[in-house]
Amino acid sequence: EQRLNYARYVYFDKNGFIRVFSLLDKLGTFLNELLEIRTERIKSHFSYFTVLRTMRERGVHPELTVPLNKLKEGCKESTHRLRRRRNTEIHYMNSEMHDDLLQQTRMYGQEVLLENLDQQLQDLATGLHMAVQSIRLTFQYAERMLHRH
């Protein structure tokens, strides 16, 4: 039963953090088009974070940029860990392979550190909160833009 629970955790955790970044990437594309940021001129493949940084550097739409940036900064540590996990998962190896490799290469008798599941769940919850609140702020701003025109 413990293995089954862990297998479920791994499936839903991976699915969760990949989907959080998928939401953010789609939001970045939406913001880029809505606000005519043209991030693709700087970087052909860009993320939400690239669009937000470009908005901040250009000083455009401060009534949206400031709260989005504040939200991002408030979730910085968790988001950084999620990004590192996502990049490891996509570009190198998944966390189970990483754990297996560490266990095989450690010296006998040393304490083996495994994934911190509680931390990972908290990071995922924080990342989801940031994504949902960023979407909310963006759509509220878009609605105000539509009413002005």
Predicted regions located by residue number:
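Long, contiguous alpha-helical bundle segments
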Residues: E1, S22-D25, Q140
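Acidic, Ser/Thr/Gly/Pro-rich intrinsically disordered interaction regions
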Residues: V10, L35, T39-H149
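Charged alpha-helical initiation segments
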Residues: E1-V10
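Short, hydrophobic, well-ordered secondary-structure elements
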Residues: Y9-L35
